Amino acid sequence: MTHSAWHDEIKQVLPKDYYRRINRFLDEVYATGVVYPPRDNVFKALQVTPLEETRVLILGQDPYHGPLQAQGLSFSVPDSIPAPPSLQNILEELAADIGVRNHHDLSSWAEQGVLLLNACLTVPEGRANGHAGLIWEPFTDAVIKVLNAKDRPVVFILWGAYARRKKALITNPIHHVIESPHPSPLSAYRGFFGSKPFSRANAILEKEGLGQIDWLK
């Protein structure tokens, strides 16, 4: 389901039967409709980025709801798929901040310790936020709480009002928060563009002795 260290720590935060409730939810929704991402990618963020290697969290809201887009990592799509508008703007800001990245698949970020987590881990086809408020938020809040309890600094990148509300869960003063409006076309020009989240995250990581992320990889 998830990387074992994540599983053990999250289990301490959630009610005892919560994993069972999640599995029942997944059985039901995947049996009765088209749901993204593919079921074996639902927990991909926690499988690719182990707890002990997490240096940065980029929090999304829910997966892309179109065919072949969602792959279990927030904002990421396969390289064969055109970049959705929010990802286009992320890559545009990255180009202005650090340099040009030609890949839409953000897996290499995840492999370097960037946890690409959505607050909701599933979505019904064609219905953005269609699974909001049903099962996922306590689980993904638990992920943030587990990171908050770490004794090694984490950089939390929070884009948009929804993600920024999660700042209330980040109470440990050793951590760092970078926040701005969302990269969506509706809000990117209100302060996402020019916010330089990638170079700012690297400056923090370097200062903390944790090594920089190669955002262009």
From Swiss-Prot:
Localization in the cell: Cytoplasm
UniProt main location, coarse: cytoplasm
UniProt keyword annotations, A-Z: Cytoplasm, DNA damage, DNA repair, Hydrolase
SMART domains in the cross-refs: UDG (SM00986), UreE_C (SM00987)
Leading EC class: hydrolase
GO molecular function: uracil DNA N-glycosylase activity
Function: Excises uracil residues from the DNA which can arise as a result of misincorporation of dUMP residues by DNA polymerase or due to deamination of cytosine.
Family according to the record: Belongs to the uracil-DNA glycosylase (UDG) superfamily. UNG family.
The protein's name: Uracil-DNA glycosylase
Organism annotation: Streptococcus equi subsp. zooepidemicus (strain MGCS10565)
